[in-house]
Amino acid sequence: MSGPVPSRARVYTDVNTHRPREYWDYESHVVEWGNQDDYQLVRKLGRGKYSEVFEAINITNNEKVVVKILKPVKKKKIKREIKILENLRGGPNIITLADIVKDPVSRTPALVFEHVNNTDFKQLYQTLTDYDIRFYMYEILKALDYCHSMGIMHRDVKPHNVMIDHEHRKLRLIDWGLAEFYHPGQEYNVRVASRYFKGPELLVDYQMYDYSLDMWRLGCMLASMIFRKEPFFHGRDNYDQLVRIAKFLGTEDLYGYIDKYNIELDPRFNDILGRHSRKRWERFVHSENQHLVSPEALDFLDKLLRYDHQSRLTAREAMEHPYFYTVVKDQARMGSSSMPGGSTPVSSANVMSGISSVPTPSPLGPLAGSPVIAAANPLGMPVPAATGAQQ
């Protein structure tokens, strides 16, 4: 085979080409470090593959913040996340990076963020109305169109990374640790992000993907919300994940996608893929979710969950879909007064998904007290974990 057919993003293709090198050359970025003594850890909120997350207090102004202490990874990965967060600072519904600090002894870096009052998505999604889902999907699209316009792919859009303060109807897209700058023609790592939200391009090892990867992931989120099926595509491994997708979207379009881009499919698929016809979205509608499903919702979903990344709606096109007409009309009427264009800090009690409300204990010492940053808490006490914390 002559190799895969190249692909370029349909929108914001040359954003980084037209920007100065220092905008996207994160490996050369010089980090400006803040003072770690400004922060006191309060409790542990959760942990992920690359970090541990704590609620903390900024003792200079007594405001709650979230401290993400990074586990040992390549320095360039840390610089990439910092550079992207700095480039996107102030963008609509983008989590605000407030400070960057480092323990002077262990040299472990930590990112300090605004605090968001989040409700565990597994609880929240069960209570959302049809309008709520439209509203929050539109808010996510604001963040995605903005980051795409800035030449950045998030690459890890999923419920765990969407913080929703439902009381104030505020949303933040968090965890930019896997985000990357888009350069046309560049080949990217396909071993990124959570299995249930992986786009077909990742599952068939097509490396010249672009912003449209985020739109597939958004489609998976929408499907899980309107059908109340979480996750929507539930594969046992990466191979089974594509099989689950093919059983619904059909194998004919999958092979059409593979042929179009001259993709060589892993031989392991020969025995497990089979032949499947395309199914109708309506088959997932039942008495418990029918109030969330509408013709425009299914049409919108159908335009996101496409094998061919080139044929998916862009974030801007998605915002113009009839599914959002009522939301757009309401926001226009209100002058977007309740829909902040920037990332205004949100007062909060918890930030990570899956965190139960617990009484906030007294601050337990400076950032150096983290079990990641230093061996022991200065007060000789462990930092308490929030119950049910997860990432």
From Swiss-Prot:
It comes from the Eukaryota. Its EC number is 2.7.11.1. Detected in blood platelets and megakaryocyte cell lines. Poorly expressed in lung. Highly expressed in lung tumor tissues. The keyword RNA-binding does not apply. Keywords: ATP-binding, Kinase, Nucleotide-binding, Proto-oncogene, Serine/threonine-protein kinase, Transferase. GO terms for molecular function: ATP binding; protein serine kinase activity; protein serine/threonine kinase activity. Gene3D superfamilies: Phosphorylase Kinase, domain 1, Transferase(Phosphotransferase) domain 1. The active site is at D156 (proton acceptor). It catalyses: L-seryl-[protein] + ATP = O-phospho-L-seryl-[protein] + ADP + H(+); L-threonyl-[protein] + ATP = O-phospho-L-threonyl-[protein] + ADP + H(+). InterPro entries: CK2_alpha, Kinase-like_dom_sf, Prot_kinase_dom, Protein_kinase_ATP_BS, Ser/Thr_kinase_AS. CDD domains: STKc_CK2_alpha (cd14132). GO terms for cellular component: cytosol; nucleoplasm; nucleus; protein kinase CK2 complex. Residues 39-324 form the Protein kinase domain. ATP binds at L45, G46, R47, G48, K49, Y50, S51, E52, V53, K68. It is an enzyme of class 2 (transferase). Belongs to the protein kinase superfamily. Ser/Thr protein kinase family. CK2 subfamily. Probable catalytic subunit of a constitutively active serine/threonine-protein kinase complex that phosphorylates a large number of substrates containing acidic residues C-terminal to the phosphorylated serine or threonine. Amplification-dependent oncogene; promotes cell proliferation and tumorigenesis by down-regulating expression of the tumor suppressor protein, PML. May play a role in the pathogenesis of the lung cancer development and progression. Heterotetramer composed of two catalytic subunits (alpha chain and/or alpha' chain) and two regulatory subunits (beta chains). Interacts with PML. PANTHER family: CASEIN KINASE II SUBUNIT ALPHA (PTHR24054), CASEIN KINASE II SUBUNIT ALPHA-RELATED (PTHR24054:SF16). This is Casein kinase II subunit alpha 3.
